[in-house]
């Protein structure tokens, strides 16, 4: 994977930081960026005392800077798993990594994070429970789409409480919704912290935000080719609405964000 090789190449040019699960670190200071080398992080905020909100989940290759995360009260980065990060000073990296590669990578990843913030606002502000959960699972699945693999394994190392917090629903509602997705053949449980997406097309149909999620996550081929300079070649053939590295255009048509029918009563089954 080109992004992974690029991250490895710059690891020796920055300060490495290793985190234990649930360890917290503050946002990087102005002028610094953090690149997640491996593991998963959560961006947390606590606008009021004792009320934590998960803003996003970060995976390997994601980039965080002070300019992409608002300095809300109590904001921090929390390791979901053991994680490795690299703290970079852009001018220092510029000396050894070609400028167009370096800036293309950072800008693409930072804009990707901002686009995800907008999608998250739509998810929790306008979608009912089932399309909200479907959108969350779809976003994770699209990161791992491969043309030769019809089924996709999605790792879920975060707790269900964290997922429910991110989606602004309660724990039991999340569990019931995931069980319904299992019952109708959309997904199946692979392990305690992983699911397998069985029918990606059907999952897309459950999410009114599928087109936006595809624009942000399914361009992984472009992201993988960033460091080899091939992204610019592919960009010319992409629809204009999907350009600018995943930035959501000012006016977006994502299908109706209508309220779904009343939630069916499902008994909790003690797991997904």
What residue ranges belong to the model's regions?
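Short proline/glycine- and basic residue-enriched helix-capping loop/turn segments at helix->loop/beta transitions
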Residues: 2-24
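Cyclic-nucleotide recognition modules
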Residues: 56-119
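Polybasic "coupling" helices that flank or enter modular domains
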Residues: 101-170
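Phosphate-/nucleic-acid-contacting segments
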Residues: 142-237, 269-272
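Short hydrophobic transmembrane-like helices used for membrane targeting/insertion
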Residues: 226, 238, 247-252
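Short hydrophobic alpha-helical segments enriched in small aliphatic residues
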Residues: 243-246, 265-267
């Amino acid at each position: 994977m080109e992004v992974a090789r690029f991250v490895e190449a710059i690891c020796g040019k920055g300060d490495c930081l290793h985190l234990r699960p649930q360890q917290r670190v503050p946002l990087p200071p102005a002028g610094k960026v953090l690149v997640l080398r491996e593991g998963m992080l959560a961006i947390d905020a606590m606008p009021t005392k004792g009320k934590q909100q998960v803003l996003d989940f970060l995976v390997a290759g994601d980039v965080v800077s002070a300019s992409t995360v608002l300095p809300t009260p109590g904001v921090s980065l929390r390791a979901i798993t053991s994680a490795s990060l690299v703290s970079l000073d852009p001018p220092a990296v510029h000396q050894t990594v070609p400028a167009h590669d370096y800036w293309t990578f950072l800008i693409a990843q930072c804009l990707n994070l901002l686009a995800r913030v907008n999608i998250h606002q739509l998810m929790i502000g306008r979608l009912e429970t089932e399309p909200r959960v479907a959108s969350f699972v779809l976003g994770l699945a699209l990161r791992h789409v491969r043309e030769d693999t019809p089924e996709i394994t999605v790792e879920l190392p975060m707790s269900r409480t964290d997922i429910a917090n991110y989606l602004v629903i309660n724990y039991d509602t999340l569990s019931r919704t995931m069980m319904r997705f299992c019952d109708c053949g959309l997904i199946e449980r692979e392990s305690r912290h992983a699911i397998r997406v069985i029918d990606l097309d059907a999952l897309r149909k459950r999410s009114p935000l599928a087109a936006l999620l595809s624009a942000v996550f399914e361009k992984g081929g472009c992201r993988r080719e960033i460091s080899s300079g091939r992204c610019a070649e592919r960009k010319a053939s992409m629809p204009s609405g999907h350009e600018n590295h995943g930035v959501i255009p000012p006016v977006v048509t994502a299908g109706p964000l209508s309220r779904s029918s009343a939630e069916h009563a499902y008994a909790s089954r003690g797991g997904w």
